[in-house]
A protein has these predicted regions:
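Binding-site signature for planar aromatic cofactors or substrates
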Residues: 1-135
Length: 135
């Protein structure tokens, strides 16, 4: 996840069990991102805007990919133009302690290799749960 400026964010979408975000962005570019504080200071931050999704063959993907570490399972880059920011108290958000990142996804992707990842997309990620096409 990268902040480009006060009105633009981008993130690398990794291969997973579904491709829901991409499918829904093809139908409607509106997106909401929510951040929660799980430590001492309660807070919820929401970013509202419109997003574009770029696949590895897109020029924007090639340009933005330089911002991220290389992941075998990289599927798309999502770029969101922020048009509204909202905060709320976060009083109902529980305390949670961060332990560490999980490594299984990247390890699994490395075993599949890039060709195996692309086959996984064909086998598992061509439609959303609603039946919408994905990229």
């Amino acid at each position: 996840f990268k902040v480009i400026d006060t009105k633009k964010i981008v993130w690398l979408n990794l291969t997973g069990s579904g491709n829901e975000t991409a499918a829904h962005l093809l139908k409607n570019k509106r997106m909401t991102i929510m951040f929660c504080s799980f430590d001492e200071t309660p807070l919820i931050l929401r970013l509202y805007g419109n997003a574009n999704i770029y696949h590895e063959s897109d020029q924007e993907y090639i340009k933005l990919k330089k911002l991220f570490k290389n992941f075998t399972g990289a599927r798309q880059i999502i770029e969101m133009d922020i048009n509204q920011v909202q905060t709320s108290c976060g009083y109902a958000v529980p305390f949670m302690e961060y332990k560490q990142e999980r490594t299984q996804l990247n390890e699994s992707d490395l075993k599949k290799g890039r060709d195996g990842i692309k086959q996984y997309w064909k086998d598992h990620n061509t439609k959303s749960l609603d039946g919408f096409e994905t990229i």
